[in-house]
Amino acid sequence: MKLQLALVLCGLTLALGQIVPRSSWCPVPISPRIPRLMVPVRLIIIHHTVTAPCFNPHQCQLVLRQIRADHMRRKFRDIGYNFLIGGDGRIYEGLGFGIRGEHAPRYNSQSIGIAFIGNFQTGLPPSQMLQAARTLIQIAVQRRQVSPNYSLVGHCQTKATACPGRHLLNELKKWPRWQPKP
């Protein structure tokens, strides 16, 4: 109980649906050279990582490091996503709020990118992942990082790609702020 209270007081709670700080999986701070976003943004772009899924903090942190390393090899400045959703129902901070991602060319300067860890071309994400994404969006609106009148789209709506997977895209189409075009 004391440890849990200490974590909550420090803002590091690991309860389901809460944001796990970047520092828990990546010791490297975000470069000050990465541009800031003009907030609130009006667009949320949903992705899937097409990696192995993860179902506990240790697995998810390993996958996050692999994704960041892959993005860096591809000459990104850092991990490309603002946030990632683990199969454990946790929200993992990538670049976080207010930092310009590298997840959807032509839209990076006006959006945040949320990636579901795994491949959702063949199946739907677990319900805890979907709920975590909804929670993150609520947090983003409450913190005035995302406009209350935001549009929600899948990555495939910004370029020719299968991302975020057909099952996840079909689910997103049921969400209230989903739009057919960015």
UniProtKB/Swiss-Prot annotation:
Tell me the keywords, alphabetical order.
Answer: Disulfide bond, Glycoprotein, Hydrolase, Immunity, Innate immunity, Metal-binding, Secreted, Signal, Zinc
Indicate which residues are glycosylated according to the record: 149
Question: Care to name a GO molecular-function term for this sequence?
Answer: N-acetylmuramoyl-L-alanine amidase activity
Enzyme Commission no: 3.5.1.28
The reaction(s) this protein catalyses: Hydrolyzes the link between N-acetylmuramoyl residues and L-amino acid residues in certain cell-wall glycopeptides
Cysteine disulfide links: 54-60
Q: Name the residues that bind Zn(2+).
A: 47, 155, 163
Subcellular localization: Secreted
Primary localisation category? secreted
- Site Important for catalytic activity — annotated at 81
Q: Does the keyword Hydrolase apply?
A: yes
Q: Locate the N-acetylmuramoyl-L-alanine amidase domain: which residues? A: 40-165
PANTHER family reported for this sequence: PEPTIDOGLYCAN RECOGNITION PROTEIN, PEPTIDOGLYCAN-RECOGNITION PROTEIN SB1-RELATED
User: What family does this chain come from, according to its entry?
Assistant: Belongs to the N-acetylmuramoyl-L-alanine amidase 2 family.
Q: What is this protein called?
A: Peptidoglycan-recognition protein SB2
